[in-house]
Amino acid sequence: MPPTARHPRRLRVGVVSDTHAPRFWKGLPERVAEELRGVDLVLHAGDVCVPSVLDELAALAPVHVVLGNNDGADVAAWGAPETLELELAGVRVAMIHDAGAKQGRVRRMRRRFPDADVVVFGHSHIPWDETSEDPDDGLRILNPGSPTDKRRQPHGTLGHLVLADGRVESWTLVEVS
């Protein structure tokens, strides 16, 4: 398919998760806004907690979100399913909040999303970047951590994912607090 406004060849994607508003997100943090200005799309991997977070993010770029274990009907009503599968710049991206325990995670996500090239997840608040050890597979799973609830991590984080011509061009974890 040739590139169009809906299916460009290259996308800059901001990736966030576990914002846990209003406890940890009192409003769009300026550092988060700085990092997300200019992205083409935002992916939120759940635990939004209040839909106003999504409204703030949507003022910067279109948002796709999945439900987290702390999200209720109001976040679901914003349009958040439990899982989501998208094609972005020719890359098949799946989203889920909880990808389960570290042990066997890539295999589990491959079974759950057999057609995905990338799975974005959250829940642990721990940044993660892992690629299948199977050379014939290539599934990559990514967790941006949390920009606002770092837990035992040294910094709050989000991710920049650049997708181009059916491949991941880059993944960068950005410290925002």
Indicate residue ranges for each PLM-predicted region.
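Short, conserved loop/helix-junction motifs that constitute active-site signature segments
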Residues: 57-60, 88, 110-114, 133-136
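Residue-level detector of beta-strand structural context in well-folded domains
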Residues: 83-84, 127, 159
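N-terminal active-site segment of His-dependent metallophosphoesterases
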Residues: 1-63, 71-82, 90, 154-157, ...
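Active-site neighborhood of phospho(di)ester-bond hydrolases with catalytic His/Asp-centered motifs
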Residues: 15-17, 41-47, 63-69, 95-97, ...
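Glycine/small-residue-rich loop that forms an oxyanion/phosphate-binding "nest" at active or ligand-binding sites
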Residues: 64, 69-70, 75-95, 100-112
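Binuclear metal-dependent phosphoesterase catalytic core
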Residues: 2-10, 16, 88-89, 111-115, ...
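Active-site environment of divalent metal-dependent phosphoester hydrolases
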Residues: 20-25, 48-53, 70-76, 100-106, ...
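Pre-active-site segment of Zn-dependent metallo-hydrolases
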Residues: 19, 24-35, 95-114
